[in-house]
Amino acid sequence: MKTRITNLSLILILAACGIIFFAGCATTETANTDKTKSLLSQAGFRVRTPQTAKQHELYASLPSNKLESGTVKGKVFYVFKDEKAGVAYVGGEPEHQRYHQLCMQQHVAQAPEEEMKHPFAESWSNQWGPRVVHP
């Protein structure tokens, strides 16, 4: 009987951990989507709501939360479908390039800085010549 209770406890603990894990993943996905939409807007992508039957058909065929590219009459365009809001972010090559610049800036801004270990830092700084302190 004690083994059965222990097994039941283990199952409940694993189930709770699974629920917490998947809830955390959903929260992370939402945060990433919100960040992407913000960067797309900053880059100049325009928010469009499908109006015609053809637009609704095209919108329905797009994958959600993924930046897709297409070419029409030699012009490249990019679309990000926000299914939750029922809109698409649409931009051309200049907006796409700006989006990538913003992503890089955001990534670099969030990169952690690490302090060099003392012996390595000292040997690194000595490579640039003697230190001169100006009054």
What are the roles of these predicted feature ranges?
Residues Q42-F80:
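Post-signal-peptide N-terminal segment of Sec-exported extracytoplasmic proteins
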Residues L62, K66, K84-E93, C103:
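Periplasmic N-terminal soluble interaction domains immediately after the signal peptide in Gram-negative
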Residues P94-P135:
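C-terminal partner/receptor-binding element of secreted or periplasmic proteins
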Residues I20-G24:
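C-terminal motif of bacterial Sec signal peptides marking the signal peptidase cleavage site
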Residues A26-E29:
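Bacterial signal peptide processing site
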Residues K2-I13:
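Bacterial N-terminal signal peptides that target proteins for export
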Residues V72-K75, K81-A85, E93-H96:
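Solvent-exposed coil/turn segments that connect beta secondary-structure elements
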